[in-house]
């Protein structure tokens, strides 16, 4: 990716970075195992970002 990035693109990339995390352990405990994984999880090699 190029070094120069417009601020709008940087914001979208940052949002994608932050939303690409697993479910915290306390959430799994609080929901009694109902929520185990993040269905929106994305792998950088397999899935392409449309930003």
Swiss-Prot record:
Cross-referenced InterPro entries: Ribosomal_eL39, Ribosomal_eL39_CS, Ribosomal_eL39_dom_sf
SUPFAM superfamilies: Ribosomal protein L39e
Single GO cellular component term: ribosome
Single annotated GO MF: structural constituent of ribosome
tRNA processing recorded as keyword: no
GO biological process terms held by the UniProt record: translation
One Pfam family linked to the record: Ribosomal_L39
Domain of life from the UniProt record: Archaea
Keywords: Ribonucleoprotein, Ribosomal protein
UniProt record similarity statement: Belongs to the eukaryotic ribosomal protein eL39 family.
Protein name: Large ribosomal subunit protein eL39
Species whose genome carries this gene: Metallosphaera sedula (strain ATCC 51363 / DSM 5348 / JCM 9185 / NBRC 15509 / TH2)
